[in-house]
């Protein structure tokens, strides 16, 4: 039995909707959206639910989205992309990095010290990059949008101020490139989906995890570790990319007017809406953690950050050098990604 589900109906006040005349006999369609975080998570409450409500409102209630958090439709987080491809779910939200090496081009944003510290420039850059470079990479699904989060933070059971403090530390990483960056800094990276982090910490399988502030409360990380290390400024240590994707046959089967509604809530508009969650909720969570008596927020110095950047340079070189065998020019993609991030960061001021 499915324990919890969110059925999101039309009628959310204050949402602008395009003119859509509803015939008396108009078909109503419900799409199932599947993801891996609990319903209390910020992305569920502040992005997926409002987004689904907006779609319902603008379709005059004809297109409803039923959200299933915490893998309630079965499977494991790395299977979400294939669930959209195969029609197990109509829509999924996941990390391309959950299946290491399968989507190599989008990894360019996940390389160390490439991303901006804010989510909005990263999200806009990833979506624009998709238009030119990623359509073939995600051809098995209908991408609604792609984006990336803000600065990642190292949360651990010991104080981390210098590279030497990371030596041998077992840290959960979200993507292949984040893992390589941690290894370059001397840590012992361990890959796992974020819902597994609390149990792994409790059983001392890991000493900490790298995640953005936004996700911390949903996995009770502030209760399980006491030390939170930030990397100052931009570029930041790492980010993670995300995709909101739909089964292509399900999309193709929608009536034209409902496709129009979904398309209006896709692409850059959806990427910006998602990024706002990280940029707004991250500082709120950080402040909550700062007020906890036993928790300590640490920011490494600029000089120490420079050491980390130098140590991580081989990670970028290895990705570039391996790109030719995968059929693309890694150096060119890296230059393009950096240029797009810089453009959108400058536009925000």
Residue ranges, per PLM feature:
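N-terminal secretory/targeting leader peptides
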Residues: 2, 6-18, 25-120, 136-349
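A gly/proline- and charged-residue-enriched helix-loop-helix capping module
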Residues: 118-131
């Amino acid at each position: 039995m499915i324990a919890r589900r969110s059925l999101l109906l039309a009628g959310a006040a204050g949402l602008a909707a395009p003119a859509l005349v509803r015939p008396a006999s108009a078909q109503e369609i419900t799409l199932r959206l599947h993801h891996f975080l609990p319903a209390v998570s910020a992305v569920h409450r502040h992005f997926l639910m409002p987004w689904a409500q907006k779609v319902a409102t603008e379709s005059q209630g004809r297109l409803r989205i039923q959200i299933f958090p915490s893998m309630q439709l079965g499977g494991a987080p790395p299977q979400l992309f294939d669930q959209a491809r195969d029609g197990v779910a109509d829509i999924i939200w996941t990390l391309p990095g959950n299946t290491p090496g399968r989507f190599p081009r989008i990894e360019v944003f996940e390389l160390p010290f490439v991303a901006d510290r804010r989510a909005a420039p990263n999200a806009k850059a990833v979506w624009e990059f998709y238009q030119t470079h990623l359509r073939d990479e995600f051809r098995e699904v209908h991408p609604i949008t792609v984006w990336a989060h803000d600065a990642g933070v190292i949360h651990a059971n010991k104080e981390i101020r210098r590279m030497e403090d990371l030596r041998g530390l077992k840290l959960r990483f979200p993507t292949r490139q984040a893992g390589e960056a941690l290894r370059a800094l001397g840590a012992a990276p361990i890959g796992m989906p974020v819902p597994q982090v609390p149990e792994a910490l409790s059983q001392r399988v890991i000493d900490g995890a790298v995640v953005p502030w936004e996700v911390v409360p949903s996995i009770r990380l502030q209760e399980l570790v006491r030390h939170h290390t930030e990397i100052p400024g931009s570029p930041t240590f790492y980010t993670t990319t995300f995709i909101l994707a739909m089964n292509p046959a399900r999309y193709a089967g929608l009536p034209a007017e409902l496709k129009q509604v979904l398309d209006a809530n896709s692409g850059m508009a959806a990427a910006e809406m998602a990024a706002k969650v990280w940029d707004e909720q991250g500082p709120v969570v950080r402040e909550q953690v700062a007020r906890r008596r036993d928790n300590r927020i640490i920011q490494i110095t600029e000089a120490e950050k420079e050491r980390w950047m130098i140590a991580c340079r081989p990670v970028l070189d290895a990705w570039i050098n391996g790109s030719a065998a995968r059929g693309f020019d890694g150096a060119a993609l890296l230059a393009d990604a950096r240029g797009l991030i810089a453009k959108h960061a400058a536009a925000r001021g």
